[in-house]
Amino acid sequence: MVATGRIIITLLAAALDEIILASKITQEAYDSDFSSPRYALTGSLAESVYGKQCYGDCVNYTCVVSRTGSLDPCLYTTKSIRIVHPAAKVLQKRETFCRSACITDDTVPWCIIDRYGTVDLCEPIKPNRKQPSLAVELSVDGKHPTGRTTTCSTRCKYRPSNEGSIGHRCVVRNGMNYAEWACSPNPVIMPPAIPTYNNAGSLDGLTECNLKTGLRIGLTIGDNEYSDSTNVSSGIAVLDYDGAVISIMTAYKQYITYVDAKEKPLTTLGILNTADDVGTKMVVYAMARVTAESVESLHKSLLNVLGDYSLPNGFGRFQRGLSGWLIGGHKYRNIEIKMLIHRRENNTEVEAISVDLKFRHGRYRLMNSCKGLIIL
């Protein structure tokens, strides 16, 4: 009996070591591609388009499918909710499909909606509730989504082939033609606590900026002095994806907040909202892949510029322009920032700062620009 017990303990220990090793290897694969500790390595409901079970969530159309970190394209069918604010300041709902699980961080639920890492609010699926299957067109080699999506005209079925499993497929009608596209089977996702959407604003800011405020910007670093800046009861709280950033804004406060990615999972670059007589507009969400070092460097530069009305020292080259001082084109890995300081006629006070941020998203190297004006 003692010997049998020892054998069982040895086998259990070996199995545990195997699980830990698999988690470490998979996590390394995630870190090398996504720098993200967010996604669980077990119990994933995601499945690759080739029918393989994902180790973690479906991120940017991709998930880990082996202990060695092999990646496959994958899909989700969770609904997202995009809230837009057109010029009339009327909130409108627009539904899209998520490409990742609907994630909540005790703030608002969000998910990734395209191959570049754009995020939206999302609607967690209720238990046992069925969602329509989402069809995604794949490239000629059948390995990469082209970006075109639609709904299936037939049921999403698992389709093996002579060469091996090809995963789930459905028939899609395109005009008078029919084609077979990859599709996502309906996952059953237990939803987190559903938050309220009061004062929720736009998450459509990766290509849209309208920075304008009559208030001074609050700057913080590390454990910030504003205790509610990372846990806001109204408005959109700090969110992050892929190891760095999304801005935070509320109805009454503006923040540019940096948190060291080595110490905390949140690394945020917040460029603020505007409160006017009509109401509050959540106007900017910026996103980029950055490192702790680049965040620290960028923070010091911004702190020099925005924390003091005088011209900063050591920010880099300065060029006198028609309307002020051009400070830029510094590049921090995938971030490029340019600032133009506008001074009043007496040239003694800073009136405004124009900001031009460019972000590269993920492996796809898509450039987005974010421009705006900060009125001090």
Curated annotation (Swiss-Prot):
Keyword Signal part of the UniProt annotation? yes
Q: Superkingdom of this entry's organism? A: Viruses
Entry protein name: Uncharacterized protein ORF17
Provide the leader sequence positions. 1-22
Q: Which family does it belong to?
A: Belongs to the ascovirus HvAV ORF17 family.
Sorted alphabetically, which keywords does the UniProt record give?
Signal
